[in-house]
Amino acid sequence: PLAYMIFRASEAYLNYMEADYMKNKNLDDYSKKYWRALRKRAGVSENFQKTIDATDLSKENDLAVWSGSQMIDKTLYNIRRERRCEFIAEGMRKDDLLRWRSLDKMKNYQTEGFNWQEYQKEPYYVKQLAAGLVVSNSKYLRPHFANELIITNNGYNFEEANYLTPISYD
């Protein structure tokens, strides 16, 4: 592990924008400047307000729409979406979802895979079933239901966000 943390300018911009909006429920001139700079570098329209205005939260299938059991507003959601796009495939998404308490919507949630009744006759899956590697309590495969913690907790469960938790260096 590194002995020091590395922050890119884009990460600092997004952290500032989110904190500014969370604190003031408004974007100051710095936040607007940073947001336009991020979008310009990405090659998309710098007019972030147009994106905010076009957002319909009821049509968004994204956990980041939620903080705990409360739906957030369109501006904060678009800051979160910008963050998701900026850090795609960098392993920051889970930390963000935990920090925002967005995973609360998955408490006691059972993930289901493909339609088990359709595919259970395939030779590969018959072997998996015989080996005890498949758990299915519905017509859909439930691959994680073999995990003892998920069975005990009746699905996924997450701790509530703790904003005083230090940033890990590993």
Where are these regions (language model features)?
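Acidic/polar-rich alpha-helix caps and helix-coil junctions
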Residues: 1-170
